Design a protein with these regions (language model features):
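Conserved mid-core segment of classical short-chain dehydrogenase/reductases
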Residues: 67, 90-105, 128, 148-151, ...
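Active-site helix of classical SDR
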Residues: 119, 155, 163
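Alpha-helical segment proximal to the catalytic Tyr-Lys
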Residues: 124, 168-172, 237
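Catalytic Tyr-X3-Lys loop
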Residues: 97-116, 131, 135, 159
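C-terminal helical subdomain
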Residues: 179, 187, 201-235, 239, ...
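Short C-terminal tail/terminal secondary-structure segment
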Residues: 93, 240-279
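Canonical Rossmann dinucleotide-binding motif of NAD(H)/NADP(H)-dependent dehydrogenases/reductases
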Residues: 3-33
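Residue(s) in the substrate-gating loop at a strand-loop-helix junction
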Residues: 139
Length: 279
């Protein structure tokens, strides 16, 4: 098993990407502390897995609660080997001219400040032991423009930058930090955006499959879980400061119709011929 006898802390682990990752980690021999604000779902998850999964309610915008969660995990489970910070929201959607300041601040608080708190306290417990893997949830919206609400995109760009900066700092301490950048995946959060109902994951999956660069293949929570598993395991032991994309090629220009700007290919070909003829 790839995480046998390992201990992990997963924020936002009661649903979506965090839940899929929790389930994947447990099958690989890991014991997990799940934190979330969804207490009922978290308690149900803990009951399902017994001693392999503990739950603690935690609001990631509260640094004191994040710090307490790390202390609880170390006390109840033992030294933390891996942290996956997946807690997040999509946030306010709309043009920049009408984006309310309070909604902007709320999104930044969860998506960026929450990441900072998780990374900070993960480093605090890992640096003295000179080992550990931290994984943050970024997004394709953090790698390119035109995707997602403005606050979400800004925060995810910042998460990518934070990952690089902290990796440079902690490499000498033996601690690794990476991020996973996903596109829209079939999760309750994305289902809300596409259908207005978090339970309509199958309907969201159909829409995602139709628009995916990998024609007919929707992105699944399990795809992200597998990426996080690799980054948490010793298999990625020489990888730090990296943002791993699970996006069906979106950020390299793949589209359902073929490569981005493929409509210009005939012009490029003709231009190339003219260039050869005139050379």
């Amino acid at each position: 098993m790839r995480l046998e006898n390992k201990i992990a802390l997963i924020t936002g682990g009661a649903s979506g990407l965090g839940l899929a990752t929790t389930e994947r980690f447990v099958t690989e021999g890991c014991r997990v502390l799940v934190t979330d604000i969804q207490a009922e779902q978290g308690e149900e998850l803990s009951a399902r897995f017994g001693n392999d999964v503990l739950f603690r309610r935690c609001d990631v915008t509260r640094e004191d609660e994040v710090e307490a969660a790390f202390e609880f995990a170390e006390q109840e489970l033992g030294p933390i080997d891996a942290v996956f910070h997946s807690a997040g929201i999509i946030g306010a959607v709309g043009p920049i001219t009408t984006t309310p300041g309070d909604e902007w601040r709320f999104s930044i608080d969860i998506l960026l400040n929450g990441t900072f708190y998780a990374v900070k306290h993960a480093a605090r417990v890992m640096v003295p032991r000179k080992k550990g893997s931290i994984i943050s949830m970024a997004s394709t919206a953090g790698l390119m423009g035109g995707l997602g609400p403005h606050a979400y995109a800004a925060a995810k760009h910042a998460v990518v930058g934070l990952t690089k900066n902290v990796a440079a700092e902690l490499a000498g301490e033996g601690v690794r930090i990476n991020a996973v950048a996903a596109t829209g995946m079939a999760t309750p959060m994305v289902a809300v955006s596409l259908t207005g109902d978090p339970s309509k994951i199958e309907e969201a999956k159909e829409t995602l499959a139709e628009t995916s660069p990998l024609k007919g293949r929707a992105g699944l929570a399990e795809d992200v879980a597998n990426a996080v598993l690799w980054l948490a395991s010793d298999e990625s032991g020489y990888t730090t400061g990296h943002t791993l994309t699970t996006d069906a090629g979106l950020t390299v220009g793949a589209t359902p119709e073929g490569p981005a700007f493929s409509e210009y290919q005939p012009l490029f070909r003709e231009g190339g011929k003219r260039g050869l003829e005139s050379s």
